[in-house]
Amino acid sequence: MEDNVECIDYNGKNIIAIHVHVFDRNTHREGLTVAGLMMFGKGLPVRDRFDNIRMDYIDKTNLEADSRWSDRLTYDGTWENNLFNFFMRVIAKLTQDLKRPFKLEGMERIDDTPIHKAIREALTNMIIHADLLITGVLKIEKYEKEFLFSNPGSLKLPMEDILHGGNSKARNPRIQNMLRMIGYGENIGSGYPTILKTWKEQNWRKPILID
């Protein structure tokens, strides 16, 4: 079998994605990979194939009286329910309140900060290490002073290896490669140490990893 390179259009921009289609040399059949479907597929086929998985983002900041959330992103028919759309929408919501200090590199303004990068790492790791074959929820909760990321499945590496970094054993390597192609999760095995380092630099409470 061969994985083909696919060009995906997102908001008028072309994004190169690998592992989206597969070609079987023996049968000469071509089709969408399971990872490609989950990442870039249409909402209904994604829900049909992955009826065991839900995606849910809940913002519990700035709550009004008797409100359970101030913002929520879930399956409501207003967006294509694939991982790529979920990732891009959630990362925008998670970081919209973060400060972006004015910084120039040459003549170009740099809006990214270590905190933005750490939050992207957390979301990326939640997705690539999720067990998409069991019943569960890819869930992110935003509170006034914390973020909570949860996914189905158990850790594939010992806790000590994750804390130390340098090793990666993604449960979804094809999805990991797709995210890396669009600029997320570049450094193998560095995600959690990056988060710890950033939170420590901010003198914030140490993040907790629970299996």
What are these regions (language model features)?
Residues 1-134, 142, 153-170, 191, ...:
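Active-site helix-to-loop segments that bind/position phosphate- or nucleotide-bearing substrates
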Residues 139-140, 188, 208-211:
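Short beta-strand
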Residues 147-152:
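Conserved DxG motif in ATP/Mg2+-binding regions
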Residues 168-203:
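Glycine-rich phosphate-binding loop
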